[in-house]
Amino acid sequence: MHMIRRAAGALAVFAVAALAAAPAWAATAQEQLDTFVATVKGATGSFKQSTVSPQGATQPTQSGTFAFQRPGKFKWAVQLPYEQLIVSDGKQVFQYDPDLAQVTVRQVDQAIGTSPAAILFGAGQLGQAFAVSALPDRDGLQWLRAKPRNADAGFSQVDIGLRDNQPARIELVDAFGQTTRVELSNLLPGAVPASEFQFTPPQGVDVVKM
């Protein structure tokens, strides 16, 4: 269970990475993402996340809310089926598992520098970290695929589907062949208060610095 939660936390970072707002519907997915990187500085919304193994086994569906503010700040709050909180203040990323009484702390560059989070929190030069290509339209969405140039990234590809000037779905295939699908909803672009990204570990919990 602990390994599953650690993986879920990493995938949460991946998921926040691809949140986007886009120009006119006629624009390609790549153009929409480019516009997002250049113009959308922050947003809030809701998510639902499910993971399927190569053998078809499923993990419990997660749901919750998120917020982000570039560069490098985000909050990913899992509410169901168990609580988990991931917060970045722009310098450090805190992952808090209440029932494990543990907080894991990583530097932002370590946590998102070579992950799909660079799509959201980076400077927009995706070609440096990813090989980006267009995909055929599917399920009423316009798609692009980002493959990491770093073989140690921990995932093989992330597909991003956009609709009505907003991201609708993210599909990530990790190094073990698991596919994680994140459905996004209620996306509201706009500035997010800095207080949303502040986190102090509760007294009595184990703090593990990576």
From Swiss-Prot:
Subcellular location: Periplasm
First and last residue of the signal peptide: 1-26
Keyword Transport in annotation: yes
UniProt superkingdom: Bacteria
CDD domains reported for this sequence: LolA
GO BP of this protein: lipoprotein localization to outer membrane; lipoprotein transport
Keywords, ordered alphabetically: Chaperone, Periplasm, Protein transport, Signal, Transport
GO cellular component: outer membrane-bounded periplasmic space
Function text: Participates in the translocation of lipoproteins from the inner membrane to the outer membrane. Only forms a complex with a lipoprotein if the residue after the N-terminal Cys is not an aspartate (The Asp acts as a targeting signal to indicate that the lipoprotein should stay in the inner membrane).
Oligomer status and interactors: Monomer.
HAMAP family reported in the protein's UniProt record: LolA (MF_00240)
The name this protein goes by in its record: Outer-membrane lipoprotein carrier protein
Species of origin: Bordetella parapertussis (strain 12822 / ATCC BAA-587 / NCTC 13253)
Phylogenetic classification of the source organism: Bacteria, Pseudomonadati, Pseudomonadota, Betaproteobacteria, Burkholderiales
Gene name per UniProt: lolA
